[in-house]
Amino acid sequence: MRVNALLPLSGLIGTALAACPFADPSALGRRAEGGEVDARQRLKEVEVDDNGQFMTTDFGGNIEEQFSLKAGGRGSTLLEDFIFRQKLQHFDHERIPERVVHARGAGAHGIFTSYGDWSNITAASFLGAKDKQTPVFVRFSTVAGSRGSADTARDVHGFATRFYTDEGNFDIVGNNIPVFFIQDAIRFPDLIHSVKPSPDNEVPQAATAHDSAWDFFSSQPSALHTLFWAMSGNGIPRSYRHMDGFGIHTFRLVTEDGKSKLVKWHWKTKQGKAALVWEEAQVLAGKNADFHRQDLWDAIESGNAPSWELAVQLIDEDKAQAYGFDLLDPTKFLPEEFAPLQVLGEMTLNRNPMNYFAETEQISFQPGHIVRGVDFTEDPLLQGRLYSYLDTQLNRHRGPNFEQLPINRPVSGVHNNHRDGQGQAWIHKNIHHYSPSYLNKGYPAQANQTVGRGFFTTPGRTASGVLNRELSATFDDHYTQPRLFFNSLTPVEQQFVINAIRFEASHVTNEQVKKNVLEQLNKISNDVAKRVAVALGLEAPQPDPTYYHNNVTRGVSIFNESLPTIATLRVGVLSTTKGGSLDKAKALKEQLEKDGLKVTVIAEYLASGVDQTYSAADATAFDAVVVAEGAERVFSGKGAMSPLFPAGRPSQILTDGYRWGKPVAAVGSAKKALQSIGVEEKEAGVYAGAQDEVIKGVEEGLKVFKFLERFAVDGDDEE
């Protein structure tokens, strides 16, 4: 029996108060400024509108560029054709190196609004006034796949946020999982080399179901915690909108007078958490590789701007090792029982990019982009990222001036002595670009904690010790937290993790690597190891109970809470062009869309009122499937055979929707469609009856999102 042994520890955690007991308004400067903010206003000066204009060269002359200059109608193209050379040359250089990780992504602009004046916990300007707004840009991504890989590959997902604050850019470069695979950044190349495609044949793409990945995971036990999260629904979210975000590392927040606390950053989705199931994600990768980026784009374009709340966990500096692990260890998360989440503000993504390359591809996030009031810790993974992210941008952009790209420019302006370099965009008036200098009158002046609201390192931070190449012994426990995570899932979610590990490990060809996997799993849970061993045809290991416990924590399960909103979820209405069914489908669509759902009517061909044909439709595109009255005719007999769609496609859509845990329904006589695929009307998440009754049921079912009763759990088939 499980018991919750994680109890709140009163008195240990500082509380964020929306009031500042010591703030001097005259010292706060820009902090007090507020007002409405346009998410893309800063980019308008570099927008180019071709409407009503003639074609020009890159240097501004009007041209015709559809035909190259030749010697006669059938002659050679002339070398002097600068128009041809410029057009082809520019095309040849349109791409920059893709990110070595997080190459596949999508982004959006938005606004962050502070819920209060949080100057009692941080000097950060963007958190210094109630209702203060700050423009943001967020880039969501997968980690391992190339830029052309599928959105729904099982992976950790990037959640990188830039705040364009009035005191410089601040980036939270996080993921949708609160922990990471390694503890020391020096092992990052090893991690990525292991999960990337094999260097001999470039296979597999965006997948870890291969020998090298699991060789690394089973040889590097620090990876197990993140691995368990990735094997759960967190690795295959329903959309970017339906996942949380985490800063991963422990940072510091510092007040104006130098008082500091340790902090963990959290983004909490206001859409609710939701995930796909594995087969659904696999099929979706083939049916619509752009599913997540299309979902984000469509939601924003339709006025359904997604939002998240920014929350923090605050910890006293002297409590870094008070909870049984080290807060400097990025493979550990801080259970909410020890430090409750304190919500600071809300972010809404309300503008899509105007140009993917100029904005989403060229934005250059860095953990080193911090502002006054925020500081680093000695987390060894964070320390390495501070170097690596800057270095990779130098590689991608072939020089140091990538911060001058419009998407990277701070709204606060840039004044320093950095000069020249490839792609220099500024014309600097200061010819005495060095400091100190009498000739430039001391400008740009030095800013610090007391003058000019400059960045300052936390007062009192010290570092000393014997030089060595090792990790602290406080980082050594690699098994307690993965077990805590697994214990905290519902039984079906646990089964999903087991099934995912079975799937991945079954692709491993080396027998010793498979045995190593079982050995590591056994240190987390003998039950997990035994259940995986059965699928691999291997002998189960004996229990290794050193780290076994029955503790649970809250906030890690995806499926045990109903969605707070069903707006923008997608419903497929199966119909037919025969017998008046389309009229019934249109009525269904009208009613469902009143509640913010996105409804697609499907039939044999694109008649009036049909949004998609059966030949183009698939259950992966919908969160619920409803059969309109009269459409039962396409589920059996001659109606199921048509040259307009693959044989049995209507039944396949309904069956897959049911198998993948979605709400399924039938109106009136269409309940015969449910019967034809062997689905009982009384099952959870199955609705049949009159239109109003079905609509009510489907909308309630969408809040549940996935009906876990439909998924088998190990032992269910035992008598």
UniProtKB/Swiss-Prot annotation:
Output the Pfam families linked to this UniProt entry.
Catalase (PF00199), Catalase-rel (PF06628), Catalase_C (PF18011)
GO cellular component labels: cytosol
Q: Which residues form the active site?
A: H102, N175
According to the lineage, what is the superkingdom? Eukaryota
> A GO molecular function for this record?
catalase activity
Write down the InterPro entries for this protein, in alphabetical order. Answer: Catalase, Catalase_AS, Catalase_clade2, Catalase_clade2_helical, Catalase_core, Catalase_immune_responsive, Catalase_large_C, Catalase_sf
Q: What is its EC number?
A: 1.11.1.6
**Pro-sequence positions in this chain?**
19-30
Q: What residue range is the signal peptide?
A: 1-18
Catalyzed reaction equations = 2 H2O2 = O2 + 2 H2O
* Cofactor(s) the record lists: heme
What does the record note about the induction of this protein?
Answer: Induced under stress conditions, such as H(2)O(2), paraquat, cadmium, heat shock, uric acid and nitrate treatment.
Keyword line? Heme, Hydrogen peroxide, Iron, Metal-binding, Oxidoreductase, Peroxidase, Signal
What does this protein do, in the record's words? Occurs in almost all aerobically respiring organisms and serves to protect cells from the toxic effects of hydrogen peroxide.
Q: Which family does it belong to?
A: Belongs to the catalase family.
> What is the name of the protein in this document?
Catalase-3
- Which species is the source of this protein? Neurospora crassa (strain ATCC 24698 / 74-OR23-1A / CBS 708.71 / DSM 1257 / FGSC 987)
Gene for this chain? cat-3
